[in-house]
Amino acid sequence: TAYRRQRQMCIRDRNIPIQIAQIAKSNSIKSFFFVSSGYADPKNSSDYLKFKGLVEQEIKNQNFDKIGIMRPSFLLGNRKEKRIGEKFGIILFKFLTPILVGPLRKMRPIRAEIVAKAMVKLANENINQSIFESNEIAELVR
């Protein structure tokens, strides 16, 4: 049911990152990096993006010395689950990528491997920024 899927999303997208952050903090880990969502904002009108923004806030409140919040647009790569709406969005945005310039660059889809490489680079270098949109994630790896 839709309620069950919504509940599973809450467990996966909220509880897991927050619990991992709490465990990391309690074990004196100084840095924390995680993948959120493009346009995440507690004030967003979209429930999903509002939810993601609240998760970001909760993790920021853990006061890590260094934090990396990756906000990719559509993530490209192999997935086990089938998300028809997301698949349509990926196809559409791949087609639109050449015209996504200027402030729209953060809407470009990005490969999951690029996000992972950017997180590793962020962990190993002195980069004084905590939130990275899709275009900024790609620039980290170039």
Where are the regions a protein language model picked out?
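Single conserved hydrophobic/aromatic residue that forms the stacking wall/gate
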Residues: 1-11
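Oxidoreductase cofactor-interface core, primarily capturing Rossmann-like NAD(P)-dependent enzymes
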Residues: 42-141
